Amino acid sequence: MYLKNHTLGLRTKASQGAPLAKAAQSLLQLKKLDCVPPKYQTAYACEGKKLTIECEPGDLINLIRANYGRFSITICNDHGNVEWSVNCMFPKSLTVLNSKCSHKQSCSVLAATSMFGDPCPGTHKYLEAHYQCISAAQTSTTTNRPSPPPWVLSNGPPIFGNGSGLIQPTPQPPPRLPTLPGVVGIHGINGVPPTHATPSSSTAMLPGGRLKGVTSATTKHPGGRHDGLRPPPQLHHHHHHTDDTAPTKSSSGSAGNVTAPSNTRILTGVGGGGSDDGTLLTTKSSPNRTPGTAASAANNNSLGIGGTAPGSGGGVVRTINNINLNAAGMGAEDESKLFCGPTHARNLFWNMTRVGDVNVQPCPGGAAGIAKWRCVLMKRVPDAGYDEYDDEMPVASSTTPMPPPSSAGGDCLHNSSSCEPPVSMAHKVNQNQRLRNFEPTWHPLTPDLTQCRSLWLNSLEMRVNQQDSSLISIANDLSEVTSSKTLYGGDMLVTTKIIQRMSEKMLHDKGTFPDQRQREAIIMELLHGVVKTGSNLLDESQLSSWLDLNQEDQMRVATSLLTGLEYNAFLLADTIIRERNVVQKVKNILLSVRVLETKTIQGNVVFPDSDQWPLSSDRIELPRTALKENSEGGLVRIVFAAFDRLESILKPSYDHFDLKSARSYVRNTAILSNDSDTNAGEMQQRVRILNSKVISASLGKGRHIQLSQPIKLVLKHLKTENVSNPTCVFWNYIDHAWSANGCSLESTNRTHSVCSCNHLTNFAILMDVVDEHQHSLFTMFDGNMRIFIYISVAICVVFIIIALLTLKLFNGVFVKSARTSIYSSIYICLLAIELLFLLGIEQTETSIFCGFITVFLHCAILSGTAWFCYEAFHSYSTLTSDELLLEVDQTPKVNCYYLLSYGLSLSVVAISLGINPSTYTLRNDYCVLMEANALFYVTFVAPILIFFVAAISYTFLSWIIMRRKSRTALKTKEHTRLANVRFDIRCSFVFLLLLSADWCCAYFYLRGAKLDEDVAAIYGYCFVCFNTLMGLYIFVFHCIQNEKIRREYRKYVRQHAWLPKCLRCSKTSISSGIVSGNGGPGGVSGGVATNSAGTLSKSKSKLPLGSSDDGHDEEQPHQQQHQHDQPANEDAIIMGAGSDCELSEAQQRRTLKSGLLAGSLQPVTPVGAVVLERGTLRSTGMASVGHASPTSSAGSTHLIFAHKHQQQLQQQPGESYYHQPDYYSWKHPQAGGQREYYNNTGVPGGGGGVGVGGASPQQSHEVFYWTQKHNNQHGKKKRGGGAGAVPASPSGSLHSRVTPASQVLFYPSYKKTSGMKQPPPSAQQAYPHYAEALDPPNNAAYYQQQLQQQQQLRQQRQQQQQQQLSSDEEQAHLLHLQHQQRRAGGQQQLPAPPPHMAQYQQELLAQQQRQQYRNKHSNCDLSQGIGLGMNMGMGQGLGGDAYYNQGGGGSSNGGGVGGDGPVYEEILSNRNSDAQHYEVGDFDVDEVYNNSVGTGVFNSMRAAVAAGGSRYGGGSLSGGSVTSRNQQQQLQAKQKQPPRRCAADDDDDDDDDDDEYDDEVTAAEQLHDSVCDDEDNESDMDDDDTHGLPPQSDERMRRLMALQDEDFKRRFQRQQRKNGLPLDYGAPPQTSAGATIAHPIEHNGAVFGVSGGVGEGSMRGAYRQQQQQLNAKSPSARLAVNELFGHGNAGPPLPPANQTPAQKRQQLQKLSPQSTTSSSSHTSHSNLQQHSAPTHHHLQHQQPQLHHHQQQQQARNLSAMLDENNTVRCYLEPLAK
């Protein structure tokens, strides 16, 4: 085997006693044991195949060694590929195989990377196992592994002494050996063995390795090295010889000592000539021995075969192989058949030589000495067609030794029949087949010519020793011989010895020259000859001479050459007595002798000059201070030298092969086995090469002078590819090795390294050799880790893409804000990081994309971290500025974030590239991270830490500020926004921590994997977990957590047929569809279209209020005046089933136009149709009809819209609706115990009114009320608005000041509770139109007929719903939709009965008593009792379950459908998604009460009230408190009208004091009003600042309310003037409703109302004055904005809204001549007592001025307010008992 960093051998303990006695004792002990040698077998399996190991029954597998990789180029190499790595090893192969096969009879293991990993990508690997079958009984007692052979020396220093004596071999051929010679293994890599073995016999020289005798004694190594490097292997000296035998002992303590007699042959060899780096012990052979007496020291006679890695720096012999030929069935007969073929080498013919013998012959070319070459057995490349995988390889034994042979010859070795078990026939048959795996080979690559010396050099050596010889002549002759003659290994030793001898003799003779100049000239000439000789030895032509030497001799020759040059140079330096610089430059050496005067030294001394040595850019710099300290007599003498090709000689001790010989050796040899007992440190030993030229500097001859200041060296790398880890070293003359003591690496890059040393000598750079087959990061992962990383990255990428698509596709859901832009950028950066990481870990460092991936990944990580910092800063700035109440796209700030994030990141990366591009390209870590140098920490780690610390700091500050604000924040918009910001901060902080943990684990994993640390696996699995969690967190936090996005997901799934049906048929999805025109701004709604089933149609398009579609011209002739040139929405869906899937299956998807053409749709276009907008869902409703949330459950709050005349719809395209929450109604709920709730809401045309309900607990309920205002565009944009865009948070209102129309609808939250009981049929009744109900002859029959029809229709619909819907929630929702359908236009709505019909009063009272409240909280589903009667004129209304719960009461056209519907309670939760298109939380508290946009709109309501409730068709105030025109005029008469001007408070007053009614308003007045309107809108923006309001307090809201009341007065007057009303409140007493009917006045269609009625406006300003009069003693009592819509107690209910104005006026005149009036309660912020909600008796006392024909009416008030949970709260005033 050829295992990296593996050596075989155990410590040998030699005995100094009598060897024969110990041998005899060992023999006796071994005879007691079983003499049967163990059988070792080898099994192979190529990559992708299974390795099967099987033993005989009763035997178990005992694994010795195993490896998954490649150490041989021949195994599993059918095509002869020589480019594969043969230094491939998986360290845990034996561990993995033990877990599968140890102590089993048979096992099978797949040889694949999934099982063992991939140690060398690109190389076809194989699994090799060495094992033996042992009995089961032996396994129970034997725990130690088999011991190596006793002759293996694992920790011995050189076993040869210093000497040169040689013994010539005998002429007869070597005797035939019974077995192959054993191999003594020495650590050729891993340091100095602790013991020395001294050879004891003659030495025969072999090419590349010496055959030497092994001594019988061993000595302790004198001590360890202290050079800072691993000690080199001690090589074998060959100078002292003894004839003692060396008994050896197994280190494992096996029984007996094995003695090697004098005639034992032990094969040893030292790689010679620089080409053989294997350390092989030489063979000791007795020249006169005979085959009969020859014996082996051990049964494991093995071959020691060195090998190298194919790296360019040369390979390293890692192991010494032991082949047990006996176990393989190869005996003496087999060995005799193996010979090395004849060949030519070094001008010699080497004849056929038997394996194990050494061929010795005289040196070539007349040189003195002998040449040697050895024949060994090595594995060969298989022949074509020969399948070597089916054969077993001879197994190497490293355990139990055989007993030594006895003198009698009766030992087991020779008498194999007495000891060896009988060999099976099959085994003998396969012997020849096994032998085919091996072939004899000459080792080493070149013969050993160490003892060969040329005659010329012998002559020069004799001359230099003579006394009168001329040194100059000898030096010249030496240089001539070395340059022109062929030298051998022995010549190299002689040459360096002559150089040293000349320097010693010149030192003695220089005193004989009295003249200084002559002395300098002679020494200079001598030095020139020496330099030329040294250059000749280093020349390439003499490379073969160096290869003739073994590694040790090479080092000794090189050291001798360096010291000889230095000694001769200092001879000249010491001779010079003045400042001088002598330069000797030859081909391979540059020598400079400098003598400097200390006083002239101005700076540091640098060598060499740029023009002196063009071969290299190396430079050495000596500090000035250090030179002066080492001066002598005012002179400093320095010797500099630079060498070329010396680096190929002075190789590190770990690398004994040069590149050429290493590759050749690997191709021709194969390691047959390896020792698996080597420790992990040896296995992980690095391969190092000398990667720079050698440069030297000296201040004293041969002295290692310590300097006070270190010198600086700049050394150029010879090899820049596949090398790493530079180390500054110097050549230690004593150890003949490189040492790092006193030197340090200051900096390095791809081409150069800068070193610093505190002494002077010869310097160079050592570097690690990286395998030429580059490994990507994934090659270091095991199979499981690789799969996990793929899965983790894939999950994270998918979720990031989903989040990005959600932000893009559902952008209508999100309010475009800075936070949205920040998170979009974060997702983009994270996506880039994940993808680049996945690409980078698959690349190799030599890939062209490696540098680009690292650069972009650096930039992406910096940008992503910066965006997290900006997100934390944005949260902080939101809390510390006015942005808390806004959610808009702050474009300048976001642009600044973009600039800082990407700009800074790109700048940092550009600077890093400019400083050191190789950091990203050639020296990075697996194409993912930069090289871990100073630049990495400055440009990568430091910015990330800065951004991270800043993000944490801002998050901490934000949390502190938020805690403070939460204690003082108002329970409105600010509180809601604080809750949102708190949630965002928490989630962002968790996100930041999760991302930081993910990246940190990835970083530590990459670093640990590179260094093969065990903890790297832990970091790897943590990275997988955190990366997966990060992807899930992004999806949950930014997608699933948002309710609006969940709804959009459901809607998206429903609308795409390509998705699976299981998703589209989800019952949790929204069951809705909208049919409407696809009109643009200014378009007209197509109206409400119903099919035969009566389902409500809905539209997906955004339509403005009061718009219609010209696509319905033919089908809707009555809408001709509302046409718009936009086509109808062909994709609109008519819902006829319970869900979209059912609808699709029933083939009921039809467009509006197709339905109209088919005649199955009956379009109903109510006058003043409006579109309620919720996201992309709109519902088209008629005026006076309540609309529920398209997506919420049944029973949502309804909005009532007053109709407008048709001609006004086109004139007012910019109308919008405003929500005015009240502070006091929410802050101070009305106190009291049990109160009865009644609904006095009348819905003309909406299905009747709601009567008095049963007793119920006091409770506030949700309701919405809205205002309307013109969009008078004056060119100046308001805050929060943009051209053509709907602002996210406009100041003071919820409309866009720029767009023609925008509608906002809010829906509360509900939870489902138990349903109501079905009321008796008697309570469910409908009421006819006024014309039929007032006709006494027909009314009874008509009511009975209508009641029966409604009951049948209700039963049919209930059956249909039960079949279609599977959940109570959807059933209730569809019931509500059907209820709206009937009220909206399914058929003509029935009005409430006249108040004088006693029979209906009794029925309503009976139903009220039967129904009771079942829930503490009820929603504001005020439409459920609509169809139960319009009885507000009688002071009665239907309440209870029929009022508040779905399907709870009887119905007519507009009544509740069904009595089993569930009840939905209010959920006080943070429902950010309940507001759409704007969020409820977007109300600015300051601006809602200050800005004129949100307050001036009430003026139109006052105008409408002043004109009379019947002025409009359906002009009653449903659900609110309305005063008659007489009452209003009486109150207005008491007010003083200030002059009309545009002042802060008085700009709305008119200077016209006429009390007469004015039908028209001049154009100048209208223009003046418009200008004043705009000025008010702008001036009121800063009301908070001008009035000095505190930022957050209850007092702040009270003061805002006071300012609001003042604003009401002036805007009310202006609105009257715009609508043609008198400018004061003092109307004549004789003014009545009839006058209003006679003079209809166009207006803006004030939008107020609750529960199916028509609201006309808030009487806040008027009521405030009225209440001040009634409560003169209580000036603090005031009327809040929530006091709305109390029905008057005079006059009957008004006609339906869908009747013509003439019909309504006629019916009103028939019913009552009185106008509608009402009283209202007021709310005080201190006690909130009820002042005007009395019973009908109290009303008569409190309002005696009312007409005596008026019916007693109980008034109720409804109000709405935003609570702290972002929910619109309703407050329904109870009737006093």
Curated annotation (Swiss-Prot):
Positions carrying Phosphoserine are: 1189, 1289, 1296, 1366-1367
Q: How is it modified after translation?
A: Proteolytically cleaved into 2 subunits, an extracellular subunit and a seven-transmembrane subunit.
Gene3D superfamilies xrefs? 1.25.40.610, 2.60.120.740, 2.60.220.50, GPCR, family 2, extracellular hormone receptor domain, Rhodopsin 7-helix transmembrane proteins
Any one GO MF term held by the record is: mechanoreceptor activity
Where is the sequence biased in composition, kind Basic and acidic residues? 1114-1127
Q: Where is the composition biased (Polar residues)?
A: 247-266, 284-303
In this chain, the stretch annotated as GPS covers: 728-773
Membrane topology (Cytoplasmic): 808-820, 869-894, 962-988, 1038-1777
Marked site, Cleavage, at 760-761
Disulfide links within the chain:
728-755, 743-757
The record's SMART domains line, in alphabetical order, gives: GPS (SM00303)
SUEL-type lectin domain boundaries: 45-134
Q: Which UniProt keywords apply?
A: Cell membrane, Disulfide bond, G-protein coupled receptor, Glycoprotein, Lectin, Membrane, Phosphoprotein, Receptor, Transducer, Transmembrane, Transmembrane helix
Residues modified by glycosylation: 5, 162, 257, 300, 351, 415, 674, 722, 749
Region Disordered: which residues? 189-304, 1096-1127, 1235-1257, 1270-1300, 1344-1369, 1511-1596, 1684-1756
Q: Which GO terms describe its cellular component?
A: plasma membrane
- What subcellular compartments does it reside in? Cell membrane
Here the segments flagged for biased composition (Acidic residues) are 1545-1562, 1572-1585
Q: Which family does it belong to?
A: Belongs to the G-protein coupled receptor 2 family. LN-TM7 subfamily.
Q: What is this protein called?
A: Latrophilin Cirl
Q: What organism is recorded for this protein? A: Drosophila grimshawi (Hawaiian fruit fly)
